[in-house]
């Protein structure tokens, strides 16, 4: 009999594992499972598999030395598993008898290599498929077959020519040794090793991953990414190359860094997707394309930093994407079978307003048309129903359906769930051009008119590139500069099949913001909304410092919740720097954090100057509300759009927008020099805001859009 020992640090997928155990038993193997995950909750499932034995490994280090526990806290996950299991006598006995050792997950890999070294187990594997092949090899050797001896392997000085089955634990020990990886020489030698000629792909991949883990443990994140990318450059298999480059890029993105090999990683996924598409495997092609889009539009690149590759050359950034065969398929318009029917004249318009959870900009629209005699309104929150939420954000399935020519089960599911709503509605108004827009355009809308509103956020995501805009009749933009950006990014929006484009401001009831201000408000700067890196509140702090050099009466009031440090490492780093910057100012009473509020008008009553410090915006609602309250508006010339045909300077009146913190301080000092000057400037701003952006004005544009009125 061939003895097989499975080791797992997390619960395996029990269905898959059960099927595999049956295959191992059919091959004449005895099977044992040792795991650091809790075995008791799945005891019945494991018993049904008819394993020859199971063993619960220690789940923690509670009864070990303080020094070891301290070391474990700093160790990689795989090392921790080994620390827990290494002294377990049952595990050692099972390993001593094992012919094949199998790591069921990444956390168990290091333990398997250590056991393979100690007990000279020739067949040590990560994954079930290679382990099953190993059983056949052991059987073929017969009883005379002896275990191979694993000699030390100096991958720094020699070419690595052994198969991954014989890779010794020395590799892992060297790769995770911080002193070696902290050394420039050591790190360079390891990178040389992973690109050595003649190394089998499996060995190259395994070695590069261990090297990357060690470098990251030693604090060399970019070095870890470089090792993986270097190994990938030597691979010919498109799938493996794409996978390794993906891992390299994610190492840096996970630390909030701009990856040096992003272009290569995206190109590799696209090449893999094209190959799978050519082979007729639409599922694999969609997985690779989904990863390419995910990497190319990762939020760390475009949302959680103060700039984005799109700021320099948006069309150039997406050009390689659209040169691929799979994206050529995605950009082909499917169109609609019949044109949208005109609004009915013999009954109220049936208007379906829909979104997925985010209804921040819908309240006034719902209120108006819910009480309009010419409209029968229904509201659908896709996130409120589990089945609808599942299809609304199934990006990978959207891609597969398009690549398969609309023959997937996903389209059937969307048809079944969404057709009743489309059949009822004359017009569908979908807010936010994200997942639900991609979902909805996988099916023909019939004669229902489809209207979608795109704010600003969507431009920095992958969703517009997954949406068939030929099935959208009207696309609403909130500002000209957003329209320019999105049309430069999405080829379909520049073609004959593009929807009608409209520029309509967000629905805001600004009349309630005109509350009396105290004389002290004149010296209070305000920033409404600081929950995103793009708001760049550090710019506002710089303005405050410049003002206080002239007059120490100026203060800064921050309205809104803080940035969520869990969003990304880039967000966490900015939040940490910002908190450090304002801590002494808060102690002095110079900066006041008012936190989130449902009563923004009251908060603005204490603010005399409203700032827009952002690096990019669609239309900055906080600035518009502040202007309506008669606070003096001072808007940064948003760097993302500065100097372009449409920008903050074309969106707001002349004089509101400044090019630097110096200009901002100068404008504030001039407009607040006297109480009369401040009140006059605020009055003019309020009059402009109320006559331009207030809901009674903007609602006419929606009436015209939905009802053809006006």
Describe the role of every protein-language-model region.
Residues 570-596:
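Nucleotide-activated donor-binding/catalytic signature segment of Leloir-type glycosyltransferases, i.e.
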Residues 134-137, 336-341, 460-464, 503-522, ...:
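Acidic anion/phosphate-binding donor-loop and adjacent secondary structure
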Residues 462, 471-500, 508-510:
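A short, active-site helix/loop in glycosyltransferases that binds the activated sugar's phosphate group
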Residues 632-642:
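Short hydrophobic beta-strand element within catalytic cores of glycosyltransferases
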Residues 518-535, 541-548, 557:
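Conserved donor-binding/catalytic core segment of Leloir-type glycosyltransferases
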Residues 512, 673-706:
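A charged, aromatic-enriched C-terminal amphipathic alpha-helix characteristic of glycosyltransferases
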Residues 615:
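Aromatic "clamp/platform" in nucleotide-sugar-dependent glycosyltransferases that forms part
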């Amino acid at each position: 009999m061939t003895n097989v020992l499975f080791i797992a640090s997390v619960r395996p997928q029990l269905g898959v594992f059960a099927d595999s155990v049956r295959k191992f038993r059919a091959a004449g193997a005895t099977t044992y499972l040792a795991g650091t995950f809790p075995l008791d909750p799945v005891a019945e499932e494991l018993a049904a598999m008819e394993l020859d034995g199971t063993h619960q490994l220690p789940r923690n280090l509670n009864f070990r030395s303080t020094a070891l526990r301290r070391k474990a806290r700093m160790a990689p996950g795989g090392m921790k598993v080994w620390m827990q299991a290494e002294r377990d006598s049952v595990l050692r006995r099972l390993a001593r008898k094992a012919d094949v050792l199998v790591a069921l997950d990444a956390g168990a890999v290091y333990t398997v290599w250590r056991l393979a070294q100690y007990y000279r187990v020739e067949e040590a594997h990560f994954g079930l498929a290679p382990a099953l092949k190993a059983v056949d090899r052991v059987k073929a050797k017969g009883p005379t077959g002896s275990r191979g001896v694993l000699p030390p392997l100096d991958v720094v000085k020699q070419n690595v020519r052994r198969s991954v089955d014989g890779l010794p634990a020395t590799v892992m020990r060297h790769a995770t040794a911080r002193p070696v990886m902290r050394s420039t020489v050591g790190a360079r030698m390891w990178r040389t090793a992973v690109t050595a000629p003649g190394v089998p792909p499996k060995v190259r991949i395994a070695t590069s991953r261990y090297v990357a883990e060690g470098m990251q443990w030693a604090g060399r994140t970019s070095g870890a990414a470089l090792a993986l990318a270097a190994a990938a450059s030597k691979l010919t298999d498109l799938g493996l190359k794409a996978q390794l480059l993906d891992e390299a890029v994610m190492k840096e993105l996970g630390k909030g860094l701009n990856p040096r090999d992003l272009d290569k990683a995206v190109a590799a996924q696209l090449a893999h997707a094209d190959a799978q598409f050519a082979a007729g495997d639409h599922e694999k092609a969609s997985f690779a394309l989904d990863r390419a889009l995910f990497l190319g539009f990762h939020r760390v690149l475009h949302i959680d930093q103060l700039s984005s590759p799109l700021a320099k050359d948006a069309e150039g950034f997406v050009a390689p994407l659209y040169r691929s065969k799979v994206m050529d398929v995605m950009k082909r318009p499917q169109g609609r079978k019949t044109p949208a029917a005109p609004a009915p004249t013999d009954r109220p318009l049936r208007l379906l307003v829909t979104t997925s959870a985010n209804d921040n900009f819908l309240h006034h629209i719902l209120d108006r048309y819910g009480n309009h005699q010419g409209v029968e309104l229904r509201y659908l929150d896709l996130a409120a129903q589990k089945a609808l939420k599942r299809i609304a954000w199934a990006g990978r399935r959207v891609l597969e359906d398009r690549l398969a020519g609309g023959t997937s089960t996903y389209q059937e599911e969307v048809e079944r769930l969404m057709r009743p709503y489309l059949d009822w509605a004359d017009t569908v108004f979908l807010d936010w051009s994200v997942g639900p827009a991609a979902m909805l355009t996988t099916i023909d809308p019939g004669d229902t008119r489809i209207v979608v509103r795109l704010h600003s956020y969507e431009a920095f995501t992958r969703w517009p590139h997954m949406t068939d805009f030929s099935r959208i009749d009207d696309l609403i933009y909130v500002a000209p500069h957003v329209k320019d950006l999105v049309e430069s990014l999405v080829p379909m929006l520049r073609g004959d099949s593009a929807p009608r484009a409209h520029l309509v401001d967000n629905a805001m009831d600004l009349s309630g913001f005109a509350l009396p201000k105290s004389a002290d408000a004149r010296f209070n700067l305000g920033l409404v909304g600081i929950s995103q890196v793009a708001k760049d509140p550090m710019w506002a702090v710089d303005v405050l410092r410049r003002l206080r050099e002239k007059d120490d009466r100026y203060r800064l009031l921050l309205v809104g919740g803080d940035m969520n440090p869990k969003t990304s490492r880039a967000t966490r780093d900015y939040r940490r720097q910002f908190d450090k910057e304002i801590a002494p100012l808060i102690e002095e009473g110079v900066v006041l954090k008012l936190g989130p509020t449902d009563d923004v008008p009251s908060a603005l009553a204490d603010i005399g100057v409203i700032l827009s410090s952002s690096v990019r915006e669609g239309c900055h609602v906080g600035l518009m509300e502040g202007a309506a309250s008669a606070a003096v508006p001072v808007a940064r010339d948003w760097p993302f759009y500065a100097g372009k045909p449409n920008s903050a300077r074309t969106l707001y009146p002349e004089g509101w927008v400044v090019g630097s913190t110096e200009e901002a301080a100068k404008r504030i000092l001039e407009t607040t020099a006297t109480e009369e000057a401040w009140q006059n400037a605020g009055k003019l701003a309020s009059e402009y805001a109320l006559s331009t952006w207030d809901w009674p004005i903007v609602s006419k544009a929606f009436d015209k859009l939905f009802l053809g009125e006006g």
